[in-house]
Swiss-Prot record:
Gene Ontology cellular-component terms listed: cytosolic large ribosomal subunit
Family of this protein: Belongs to the universal ribosomal protein uL6 family.
Function of the molecule: This protein binds to the 23S rRNA, and is important in its secondary structure. It is located near the subunit interface in the base of the L7/L12 stalk, and near the tRNA binding site of the peptidyltransferase center.
GO molecular function terms listed in the Swiss-Prot or TrEMBL record: rRNA binding; structural constituent of ribosome
Source organism phylogeny: Bacteria, Pseudomonadati, Pseudomonadota, Gammaproteobacteria, Oceanospirillales
Protein name per its UniProtKB record: Large ribosomal subunit protein uL6
Region (Disordered) residue spans: 153-176
Native source organism of the sequence: Chromohalobacter salexigens (strain ATCC BAA-138 / DSM 3043 / CIP 106854 / NCIMB 13768 / 1H11)
GO BP: cytoplasmic translation
Keyword Ribosomal protein: yes
Subunit structure, as described in the record: Part of the 50S ribosomal subunit.
Basic and acidic residues bias spans: 153-170
Superkingdom, taxonomy of origin: Bacteria
Xref: PROSITE patterns: RIBOSOMAL_L6_1
Underlying gene: rplF
Length: 176
């Protein structure tokens, strides 16, 4: 049984929640996000917080816990937003953000242009650091994974694109 679902989601000031049938819409300072709620979950709104209750089926507690976690991420996203940083290691590897396009020089014979989706912004404080910001946590992680996939870090020299908090396990080179 999920213990996550037993705790309500507190709504910070400036966040509006609208429930219609099985669609939840949350509006805040960072934007508006919506999600469809599973049929086994009922959401109640009272005194600045959301509560979650399961239906009668045995497996509905799992969906209640999942739904509560997703709603918590949406509320945090529209009130504070999420950031994810990427670091680029390698000689001549660099990034430059211009508008909604990210230009990457990653050792290929051509520069890589990545068009950022709606709702995600990128900054490059240094030419080896990319800071991504979004209200949608899932979309932010997907964009970061797609950028990292252009040149994932390799274990011998550590060259490539890695997440800011990622530790790359290094291997020793072959000895003669």
């Amino acid at each position: 049984m999920s213990r996550v679902a037993k705790y309500p989601v507190k709504l910070p000031s400036g966040v509006e929640v609208k429930l219609e049938a099985n669609k939840l819409t949350v509006k805040g300072g960072q934007g508006t996000l919506s999600m469809t709620v599973h049929s086994d979950v009922t959401i109640g709104q009272e005194e600045g917080q959301l509560t979650f209750n399961p239906s009668e089926s045995a497996k509905s507690w799992a969906m209640v816990g999942t739904t509560r976690a997703l709603v918590q991420n949406i509320v945090t996203g529209v009130s504070e937003g999420f950031t994810k940083s990427l670091e680029i290691n390698g000689v001549g590897y660099r990034a430059q953000a211009s508008g909604n396009t990210l230009n990457l020089t990653l050792g290929f014979s051509h520069p890589v242009e990545y068009k950022l989706p709606e709702g995600v912004t990128a900054e490059t404080p240094k030419n080896t650091t990319i800071v991504l910001k979004s209200a949608d946590k899932q979309q932010l992680g997907q964009v970061a994974a797609e950028i990292r996939a252009f040149r994932p870090p390799e274990p011998y020299k550590g060259k490539g694109i890695r997440y800011g908090d990622e530790e790359v396990r290094r291997k020793e080179a072959k000895k003669k």
